[in-house]
């Protein structure tokens, strides 16, 4: 069914997604021992279609597995297990984004891979520098337009208003606002 929905996507993008999904159907669960935030594999055709579009736009040739990210708020992340990249998306993010916004946020995560943002110290703390986030935003916006990227960043900022403690909420809001400002 997913193949029919994806229609005219390139063979390489299909191979990268479907071969990895077939060979590692439970890879998200295997890796969840390493990263407790990752859960079941995402097979939603809308997410797969957005990911294929990003892979084609980026020229990425690395295998990707899409995993549900266990967090109570809108978020996305990229992690790796060897040469395999795992993109984590929360259900809330998938449910509250348009197709264009979904491509923008997946594009942002794949931009981290393309730009080589793989500092081991950053990965240990699951934080990235503001500069690397802005560069990933800019690359995703170049692939799919500024408006979807700005829109999804605004949704992330609005959702960050639920974070506790207040210091974390204020910091996240300010960082996301700065990223929106940098794109305009």
Regions found by a protein language model. Give the residues of each.
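N-terminal secretory signal peptides that target proteins for export/translocation
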Residues: 1-4
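Bacterial N-terminal signal peptides
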Residues: 9-21
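Peri-catalytic and regulatory segments of divalent metal-dependent proteins
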Residues: 24-104, 110, 114-118, 142-143
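Short helix/loop segments within enzyme catalytic domains
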Residues: 28-59, 124-173
């Amino acid at each position: 069914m997913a193949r029919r929905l994806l229609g005219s996507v390139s063979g390489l993008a299909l191979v990268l997604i479907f071969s990895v999904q077939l060979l590692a159907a439970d890879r998200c669960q295997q890796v969840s021992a390493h990263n407790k935030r990752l859960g079941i594999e995402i097979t939603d055709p809308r997410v797969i279609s957005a990911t294929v579009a990003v892979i084609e736009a980026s020229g990425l040739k690395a295998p990707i597995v899409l995993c549900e990210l266990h967090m109570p708020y809108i978020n996305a992340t990229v992690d790796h297990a060897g040469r395999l990249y795992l993109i984590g998306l929360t259900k809330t993010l998938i449910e509250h984004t348009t197709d264009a916004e979904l491509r923008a946020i997946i594009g942002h995560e794949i931009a981290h891979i393309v730009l080589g943002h793989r500092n081991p110290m950053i990965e240990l703390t699951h934080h990235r520098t503001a500069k690397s986030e802005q560069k990933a935003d800019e690359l995703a916006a170049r692939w799919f337009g500024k408006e979807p990227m700005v829109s999804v960043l605004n949704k992330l900022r609005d959702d960050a208003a639920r974070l506790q403690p207040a210091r974390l909420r204020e910091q996240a809001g300010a960082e996301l606002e700065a990223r929106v400002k940098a794109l305009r």
